[in-house]
């Protein structure tokens, strides 16, 4: 692998995943990952542009930012690219009325959306809401439509909380795809449109940006396919087998966000 200076040269913007990179969710809101609060502060004091890019779909953007601030992070709503607001924009543009299979914590993001007589389904990480009854209702709505449309806020397989690994929205999305014989439209990582909007909001080109995440497929693979560079942290959902993934190879592997920031401040924007 090339030297760090070569791999990080010309980076002007940094996209940060949140869960598994900044903090691990769980009881009482979860816990910041060691060194991550100061790492974010150091990045923001540098010349590099910083944006937070998350597939979080159990909390509204306001609630997520509130949690991060309580954990000590310097972050504002305007710095966060999240899938629920992006999905609302798509629904309005296309005149769609969703049946929502989402967590109560994110439902407020859809307050301005008409959900009467639904002509599509939006699925997110509903947690305990993924009951047979709720999954079957989403299935029935889709099967009654002539042209069924399913939106999924991300398609992650699992994520890490302080109590252990938790199933993400992806397995439930796949179940509805299989049952209905359709393919979901993913809003969130690894969708190219999601990375595009985050970079536009940050004001940098793909080749000038780097993604830092714990998901080898959604964060690293998605960013690289869009023309960005990507580092994987060995925190959150990281597993040692990720470093030998058959299809995705990160531009570098670091122990945590603090190490990534050390390297970026040493080598980026040169």
From Swiss-Prot:
EC number(s) reported in the record: 3.1.3.-, 3.6.1.1
Cofactor binding notes: Binds 1 Mg(2+) ion per subunit.
GO cellular component term of the entry, any: cytosol
Main subcellular location: cytoplasm
UniProt subcellular location: Cytoplasm; Nucleus
Stretch forming the signal peptide: none
Keyword Metal-binding annotated: yes
Expression sites (tissue/organ): Detected in liver (at protein level).
Gene Ontology biological-process entries: phosphate-containing compound metabolic process
Subunit structure: Homodimer.
Protein name stated in the entry: Phospholysine phosphohistidine inorganic pyrophosphate phosphatase
Organism: Bos taurus (Bovine)
Gene: LHPP
